[in-house]
């Protein structure tokens, strides 16, 4: 029940040579800590990219409004649809984040 070999057994592949055991344990431990961190970075990058796209389109619609009102209105409609898409993507990203985090831990 409290055997360290059983608890740390998943850090080593079967048949690992004895001199490589300390190095592989360190590498696998670092890998276990990096996975959730990389998952958070990916989630942040995906959400930031969506927000930047919405900001760019909103700025374009604002600039186009005095010159071409019809194009600005069409751009605003596209902006609204992209906002709905961004909300859906955020929900999917949250689901994937929680699912993968629970698998990693």
From Swiss-Prot:
Q: Which PROSITE patterns match?
A: ATPASE_A (PS00449)
Keyword list (alphabetical) reads:
ATP synthesis, CF(0), Hydrogen ion transport, Ion transport, Membrane, Mitochondrion, Mitochondrion inner membrane, Transmembrane, Transmembrane helix, Transport
Does the keyword field hold NAD?
no
Query: What does the record give under GO molecular function?
Result: proton channel activity; proton-transporting ATP synthase activity, rotational mechanism
How does the record classify its membrane topology?
Multi-pass membrane protein
Per the record, GO CC terms? mitochondrial inner membrane; proton-transporting ATP synthase complex
Name the InterPro entries for this protein. ATP_synth_F0_asu (IPR000568), ATP_synth_F0_asu_AS (IPR023011), ATP_synth_F0_asu_bact/mt (IPR045083), F0_ATP_A_sf (IPR035908)
| Subcellular compartments | Mitochondrion inner membrane
Please, which domain of life does this record's source organism belong to? Eukaryota
Q: Which residues cross the membrane?
A: 14-34, 47-67, 72-92
CDD domains in the record, alphabetically? ATP-synt_Fo_a_6
Q: Name one GO biological process term.
A: proton motive force-driven ATP synthesis
Known catalytic reactions: H(+)(in) = H(+)(out)
Q: Pfam families this protein is in?
A: ATP-synt_A
State whether it acts alone or in a complex, and with which partners, per the record. Component of the ATP synthase complex composed at least of ATP5F1A/subunit alpha, ATP5F1B/subunit beta, ATP5MC1/subunit c (homooctomer), MT-ATP6/subunit a, MT-ATP8/subunit 8, ATP5ME/subunit e, ATP5MF/subunit f, ATP5MG/subunit g, ATP5MK/subunit k, ATP5MJ/subunit j, ATP5F1C/subunit gamma, ATP5F1D/subunit delta, ATP5F1E/subunit epsilon, ATP5PF/subunit F6, ATP5PB/subunit b, ATP5PD/subunit d, ATP5PO/subunit OSCP.
**Role of this protein:** Subunit a, of the mitochondrial membrane ATP synthase complex (F(1)F(0) ATP synthase or Complex V) that produces ATP from ADP in the presence of a proton gradient across the membrane which is generated by electron transport complexes of the respiratory chain. ATP synthase complex consist of a soluble F(1) head domain - the catalytic core - and a membrane F(1) domain - the membrane proton channel. These two domains are linked by a central stalk rotating inside the F(1) region and a stationary peripheral stalk.
Family to which this protein belongs: Belongs to the ATPase A chain family.
Which protein is depicted?
ATP synthase F(0) complex subunit a
- The species this protein was found in: Salmo trutta (Brown trout)
């Amino acid at each position: 029940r409290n055997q360290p070999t059983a608890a740390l057994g998943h850090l080593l592949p079967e048949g690992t040579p004895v001199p490589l055991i300390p190095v592989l344990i360190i590498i696998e431990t670092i890998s276990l800590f990096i996975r959730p961190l990389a998952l958070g970075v990916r989630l942040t990058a995906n959400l930031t990219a969506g927000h930047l796209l919405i900001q760019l389109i909103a700025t374009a619609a604002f600039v186009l409004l005095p010159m071409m009102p019809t194009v600005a209105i069409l751009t605003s409609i596209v902006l609204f649809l992209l906002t709905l898409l961004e909300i859906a993507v955020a929900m999917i990203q949250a689901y994937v984040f929680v699912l993968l985090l629970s698998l990693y831990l």
